[in-house]
Design a protein with these regions (language model features):
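Hydrophobic h-region of N-terminal signal peptides that target proteins for export
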Residues: 17-27
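Compact, glycine-rich, soluble single-domain proteins
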Residues: 28-149
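Sec-dependent signal peptide recognition
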Residues: 7-18
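Intrinsically disordered, low-complexity cationic segments
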Residues: 3-4, 14, 25
Length: 149
């Protein structure tokens, strides 16, 4: 075999490896969350954010609570007095999901974002995974807020 042919085969192999990895990368998507959740409770006041989903024994499968802070920064949630296992997605000011965590009922440990977040969406534990909603996807937050008025 000629050296030129071997170089061609080597480049072709690298190209196919590259295509394989690129095709397996998660493509982020823009999500209209109202297509997934029939009820989204919006909490923007301090007292409402502080209480969150405390004391509720159950929440519907297609229910979410959207927390809105007056500033973008590192935000924290906890599960004190919360009966239902939850997942939380921290969302930046542009609507991009930056982190997703599963939270344990009654835990007093804070679950904090490591990046600046403006919003958080709490849902039943495992819901994001079930819906194939991932870090990097974007939620149309402004659309939710416009429909809430």
């Amino acid at each position: 075999m000629s050296k030129q042919y071997l170089n061609f085969v080597q480049k072709l192999f690298k190209y196919f490896i590259f295509l394989f990895f690129v095709s397996n990368l998660h493509a982020s998507k823009v999500i209209d969350i109202k297509e997934y959740l029939s009820e989204i409770e919006i909490v923007s006041k301090y007292e409402d954010r502080k209480t969150g989903l405390m004391y509720r024994r159950t929440i519907p499968k297609d229910y979410g609570m959207l927390f809105i802070w007056p500033y973008e920064g590192k935000q924290c949630m906890w599960m004190k007095n919360t009966f239902v296992p939850l997942s939380v997605a921290y969302i930046d000011i542009k609507g991009k999901i930056i982190e997703i965590y599963d939270m344990v009922p009654f835990s007093k440990d804070s679950v904090c974002s490591t990046k600046a977040a403006k919003y958080a969406l709490e849902v039943n534990s495992g819901w994001f995974e079930e819906q194939d909603i991932n870090v990097g996807d974007s939620i149309e937050v402004k659309k939710i807020l416009a429909n809430d008025k």
